[in-house]
């Protein structure tokens, strides 16, 4: 997967408090 996309998801998920994301 794309590093930039994963970083974006991680940032959004972290701010939303919904870190149900698999690399």
UniProtKB/Swiss-Prot annotation:
Q: In which tissues is it expressed?
A: Expressed by the venom gland.
Superkingdom, natural source = Eukaryota
Give the E.C. number(s).
Answer: 3.1.1.4
* Keywords for the protein's UniProt record, in alphabetical order: Calcium, Disulfide bond, Hemostasis impairing toxin, Hydrolase, Lipid degradation, Lipid metabolism, Metal-binding, Platelet aggregation inhibiting toxin, Secreted, Toxin
Q: Name one GO molecular function term.
A: phospholipase A2 activity
Enzyme class comes to hydrolase
Q: How is it modified after translation?
A: Contains 7 disulfide bonds.
Cleaved signal peptide residues = none
Q: What is its main location?
A: secreted
Catalyzed reactions: a 1,2-diacyl-sn-glycero-3-phosphocholine + H2O = a 1-acyl-sn-glycero-3-phosphocholine + a fatty acid + H(+)
* Compartments where found: Secreted
Cofactor note (record): Binds 1 Ca(2+) ion.
Required co-factor(s) are:
Ca(2+)
From which organism does this entry originate?
Trimeresurus stejnegeri (Chinese green tree viper)
Task: Give a GO biological-process term.
Answer: lipid catabolic process
Cellular component aspect of the GO annotation: extracellular region
What does this chain do? Snake venom phospholipase A2 (PLA2) that shows a moderate inhibition of ADP-induced human platelet aggregation when tested on platelet rich plasma. Exhibits moderate hydrolytic activities and prefers the anionic micelles (dPPC with deoxycholate) to the zwitterionic micelles (dPPC with Triton X-100). PLA2 catalyzes the calcium-dependent hydrolysis of the 2-acyl groups in 3-sn-phosphoglycerides.
Protein name, as recorded: Acidic phospholipase A2 CTs-A1
Family stated for the protein in its record = Belongs to the phospholipase A2 family. Group II subfamily.
